[in-house]
Amino acid sequence: MPGTSDILHNDVVIFNFPYPERWDSIGFDVMLYYAKRCIALPGDTLEIKNGHYRVSGYGGSLGNIESQDELARIMSTEQGVQWLIKQNCYYAYPFDSLLNWNIKELGPLYIPRAGDQIHLEHSSVVLYRQLIEWEQGAKLTEQKGCYQLGGNEITNYTFQKNYYFMGGDKTENSRDSRYWGLLPEEYIVGKVWRIWKSIDKSTGTTRWERIWKKIG
């Protein structure tokens, strides 16, 4: 997308959802769009601490703080954590038993940018396998501690694309990068500046008072 270099932290972005069929493999559905807030940019290192987003070197707030506070309140009790587990929304990307990340404590997670190189080991492969396979159109496999990409042995990998971490404003109920991973730059359609449609889920009626309101 032209102008993706202008995307900043907290911008609301519309994009083609990159995981339409399964969360471990990037695909494409031209009719499936999401709108989420940009939490982390290419080159950022992101963490989630007690449900709140943190990006190394960035001093401002990220995402909907009130919603993150509410999520932290829910997770402050074992009952709240168990409720989230039953809702299948507590454990987080990349759903690996060794990392054991969840929406309360996640990271640090580096957000790749084009030209970045990583060494292939268990943690890096778990985090970035789907990106590597999507960029190369080949399977990344492991045998006896050695990795092969499309049948060729590989020890390091250089990313060809930029990626973003996206978060929904309803932190306690949003299927975002905490669950499905990172967003490739070319899936971005543009920024969202104003609300053009708002439907009350309980009644199915249009919330006219929200139409054309500027998104902050």
Language-model segments: residues:
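Soluble "head" domains of membrane/secretory-pathway proteins
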Residues: M1-G216
